[in-house]
Amino acid sequence: MNNQDTRFANQYAIQWFPGHMAKTLRMMEQEIQHVDASLVLLDARIPLSSLNPEIERITARKPKLYALNKADLADPAVTEEWIRYFHEADAGCVAISAKQKGGANAVKAAIERELSGLLARRQNRGMAGAKTQVMLCGIPNVGKSTFLNTFAGSARAKAADRPGVTKGKQWVSTEKFDLLDMPGVLWKKFDSKTIASNLAFIGSIKDDILDVEELAMNLLDEVRRNYPDLVAQRYKLDAETLALPPYELMEAIGRKRGLLVRGGEVNTERCAVMLVDEFRACKWGRISLERPPQRDDMADFAEEDEE
């Protein structure tokens, strides 16, 4: 098989929409009517790809704040570009790391800014003490449970570094806010291979349904285009090796790491798992997989980014 020619053949066909996600979307359509606002967590490495068009549709008529979570894993300069992009579209947006308390405090302050009109009206009506009800939503594995625990100051939600941990809605109450945590949800069909690949790279699609070797090759090919020095430094690669076709590059890295089977062949599956795991753990360095597109408004976020 010619791995270089076929490396994108299957990524375009990635789909993952189990039944509980359809149920979650129906639940969100009901619950959005009873909250004051929505807080949409996006992955700071892929803000566009992690923006679920179904969540956008459901939350469109309520005040909304976007939080670019896992900002500690993303390229800080690119994250600043995204913040400007959202703000220029008059969309509230903050960059956070859910594991850090400062991120939760930034979100609380931003929610109050976004809802300043509502809070002022409540104060005029003698309801200044009423808690603000906010729906927390996003794609799987975007860090909602970790954020919720930091926001609440205690372990209220089960958190894990894999998609699909939160299965049902739950209310979490703090001094000023009642947060409705919704399970992570994707959408029925990814019409863009870029979106599907990006979601797979960060672990928002179950690894069990993916070809891990193809995933690792695609990831290497993507990252070395924009961050060649980080890949070269991590795996001690010279320029000639870094320029190899993706499969040969993966083999070269596996050989350097001693990931061999009997006969001296590289265990490419084991190498692929190592590569994906190290990227997700930020061992390659702080990397962003997409930059803001040249678009005029936030409505374009829901459109396909390419064929």
Task: Go through the PLM ranges and name each one.
Residues 133-153, 157, 182:
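Glycine-rich phosphate-binding P-loop
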Residues 98, 148, 177-180:
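Conserved active-site beta-strand-loop modules that form the wall/rim of enzyme catalytic pockets
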Residues 106, 110, 146, 218, ...:
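Alpha-helical scaffold segments in soluble metabolic enzymes
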Residues 1-38, 45-46, 51-53, 58-64, ...:
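Helix-rich effector regions associated with P-loop NTPase G domains
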